[in-house]
């Protein structure tokens, strides 16, 4: 699947706090989107959403960039493992 990478930094002094701060902003503006702050040495990353298609992620990316133009330059769609909700009564 796909997610939107909003932030990635390896500055050990500020990266974690920046990722968590930006996560809070996105959660307030888009509560329906899951957020994921991860640390894979040496990078702290903030990724958003669980999208099955690149097109679906791209549409969400447009909305995120409109809401947060100051962060738009760093935002991009990335391939990632995603969480898929399976609704009761259906099997996959």
Ranges and model annotations:
Residues 5, 47-49:
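Short glycine-rich or small-residue beta-strand-to-loop segments that form or flank ligand, phosphate
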């Amino acid at each position: 699947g796909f997610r939107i990478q909003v932030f990635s930094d390896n500055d050990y002094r500020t990266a974690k706090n920046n990722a968590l701060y930006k996560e809070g902003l996105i959660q307030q503006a888009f509560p329906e989107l899951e957020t994921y702050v991860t640390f894979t040495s040496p990078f702290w990353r903030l990724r958003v959403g669980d999208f099955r298609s690149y097109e679906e992620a791209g549409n969400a990316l447009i909305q995120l960039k409109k809401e947060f133009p100051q962060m738009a330059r760093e935002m991009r769609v990335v391939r990632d493992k995603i969480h898929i909700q399976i609704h009761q009564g259906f099997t996959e």
